[in-house]
Amino acid sequence: NKIVNMAGHFAGLNFEVPEDIRQPQNLKLDKNGKPNKMNATYRQMAKLRSIYPKNQVKVLNIIGDIGGKTDGTVPNVSSLSLKYIIGNRAKSYRVMKFTGKNARHSRLHENAQVDKALIMFLWNK
């Protein structure tokens, strides 16, 4: 079993969105990916930590960085907070960061490097 997360806004977004999904100001993660502040949506997702399948799922977390630690829409800190939700329950957890103009949020799914990484992860080709 494998799962790919691409440009996930787990800890929230920094623009005008409902407060429940807005990223808290000055968000930081500890070494386990745990945010120093959590919005309501993240608190709900964090409750799933104890029921996430143990040692069954390989996880690939793809993030983009066009500069400034963001893909232009989702701050990297928000995407990286997935680590805490999954905790140490995943069979494996890997982050792949892509940089440059083709790492923009809306372009990640069209990025040839991302495609190669997905093919390798999902089908070992």
Please state what every model-predicted region is.
Residues 1-54, 71:
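Serine-dependent carboxylesterase/thioesterase catalytic core
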Residues 51-125:
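C-terminal catalytic-base region of ester-bond hydrolases, centering on the histidine
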